[in-house]
Each structure stands twice: as C-alpha cells, then as structure tokens.
UniProtKB/Swiss-Prot annotation:
Protein origin, superkingdom: Bacteria
Coiled-coil stretches noted in the UniProt entry, renumbered to this chain: none
GO terms, molecular function: DNA binding
Annotated protein name in UniProt: Xylose repressor
Family: Belongs to the ROK (NagC/XylR) family.
Function: Transcriptional repressor of xylose-utilizing enzymes.
Keywords: Carbohydrate metabolism, DNA-binding, Repressor, Transcription, Transcription regulation, Xylose metabolism
Lineage: Bacteria, Bacillati, Bacillota, Bacilli, Bacillales
DNA-binding residue intervals: 29-48
An annotated GO BP: D-xylose metabolic process
SUPFAM superfamilies: Actin-like ATPase domain, Winged helix' DNA-binding domain
Amino acid sequence: MDIADQTFVKKVNQKLLLKEILKNSPISRAKLSEMTGLNKSTVSSQVNTLMKESMVFEIGQGQSSGGRRPVMLVFNKKAGYSVGIDVGVDYINGILTDLEGTIVLDQYRHLESNSPEITKDILIDMIHHFITQMPQSPYGLIGIGICVPGLIDKDQKIVFTPNSNWRDIDLKSSIQEKYNVPVFIENEANAGAYGEKVFGAAKNHDNIIYVSISTGIGIGVIINNHLYRGVSGFSGEMGHMTIDFNGPKCSCGNRGCWELYASEKALLKSLQTKEKKLSYQDIINLAHLNDIGTLNALQNFGFYLGIGLTNILNTFNPQAVILRNSIIESHPMVLNSMRSEVSSRVYSQLGNSYELLPSSLGQNAPALGMSSIVIDHFLDMITM
C-alpha cells in the first residue's frame, strides 16, 4: 500500500472513530475497537490524533468487567461553534450552537422590511453579536448556515423567493468574504427537515417529509437519510402545486396554488374583517377561547392542509410527515381535521404506514438544521 493509500485509510478510520465517539460518549478504546472492528493499536493511534486535534478528551475511568478500569473518551463539543440562521418573510431567527447542536446563544428579530439590503445588514449585526459573545474554543467559529424560503440553485445562490420577491442574490459569497469561514445557503424547508432528522421528531426515521406552513408552504424531502434537492436544487415547492385550476392568482404566477388555501396568510385572510385586522397570535388566542368563527376557520384550514398532504403521501410514501406551524403545534383541532381528511383520501394501500406529526423543534428547526449542516462539513474536513 503506497503512502497516499495509507493516509486515506487513516482518515477513513479516524472519521469512523470520531462518529462512534460522538454517538456513544463516554466510550473506552476497547469498546471502540469492538464496535468498529479496528484493531486496538489502530484505535489507540487514531484516538491520539483526535486528542491532539482537540476533538476528543479523556474524562477518567469507567466500569471494569474484570481487570483494569478503562479510560473513557468524550467528544469535545466545545471545540468550536456554529451559527444557524433562518431568514423568514418577516423575521430572522438565529442561533449559536456547540458541535453537538446545543443552543448556546439565540436571537430573534422582527423584520419591518424584507428588502435584501436591510435583511443583510441585520444578518451581519446578528452574526457579529454571536461572534463577540461566543465562548473561547480551539476552532472558534467553524461556519455559518443561512436558510431562506425560496429557490436555491446548486451554487447556493438565491434564485427567487416568492413571498419576499428576492431574485438572483449571491448572499453566500458576500457573507463568506466578510467572515472568512464556510457559508452554506439552503432552502428553509430543507433546513427544517434536516433539523428534525438530526435533533427532532424524525430522528428515528429514514424517509420523511417536512412541511413548513407560514406565509407560504414549503416542503423538505429526506429519502434514505439524505436531503433530496432535485436536478436543479429546486425540489420541495409543493406549496405551488395546483389544487384548483380556476383558483385565484398566486405570487408565483400560477393559479389555485395549495398555499393560497392552507398557509398562515390564507388563514388570516379568511378571518379578517373591515372592523378588525387580526394577527396570527390573535387567532391562536381566539382558538383557545373556543371562538366559533375561528374554530370553523381552523377546521377549514385543516381540510385544505389534508388535501395537499394526501398528494404528498401518495407521491412519496414516507414514514412520517412533520408539520411546522404554531397552531398545529398548540391546537389539536387542525391536526385532527387534517388527519381525518388524509385518512379519507389517501391511497388505501398506504394503510397505517405513515405518521402525521407536529414539529418537536418548532421555530428553531430550520436554524438547527443549518447549524447541523455546518457541523457536518466541519467534521468531514477535520478527518480529511
């Protein structure tokens, strides 16, 4: 075996060991050897390298099954920090996490304007805040992940965001040049799907659909544990599937799109009156007070969600559909209405092979997904 091959094998072994330590901390060298199939000298050598790189440290002795007590190893989650930011139509939600995805700092900002220039200024201010407040660590800031609700191409450029009307914006390059760290731009629903897969309701599933219901509707698709982005990177725009070919015109240029009937914007529109302009929080409050008009609107909201979800289930046949929406997460009526509609329409052979679940991460799902994408890249680079 030549030197290049030896180096490659060492890096593969290092990656395998780091993955096991990350998953099973605290763990002994002997247990690592048993779980990976690597011999003890290889484990010892590669663990020493990981310790020199500040990725792993020893925490003392574990229980013995006979003989000397083993020295236990732990993944150093504080070796560096990652920024994940979710840019919505009218908000920015940002987090700073350690290498295990634990949130260390967070910040939420309401957007008075969603112009790209103003949004970028707020983004930079938020990132600066995280950097100045970030704890000391061997690797410092390892990267920044930002998601937006719209079309992202394979070069991670923002092609179009229907509800804030951004077009052809290279946010990645400008942020990367400013901070000199890896930057990742992703679709918001893809980021949410990844967040739920790594940390949330989809942790134990390999094939899931994540549905983000806010001003519009986006879906993130995970097939066999991998994000599916499509040929051009534009998969998941199911909010713009037609459910009424004679319906009203959508901001995307089409007619009768699903999100015109089943988004937060559609729900608000159905309840607005000339006398009073309701906020989304007003609807949540009225629902908890059992206001008849609001409950009827929520029933209808669940009905239209069920129509679209039936199409998604029949198309993808996932193990679970994870739904991110504050009303769905807090009020059972919408979920019940939706489940009823789906069960009456979905392809009968699907039976009980799927679950409809509210998000367990709520508004932090996309930001956590972006932070996790950054961490994955960092851990890959460390063992390259």
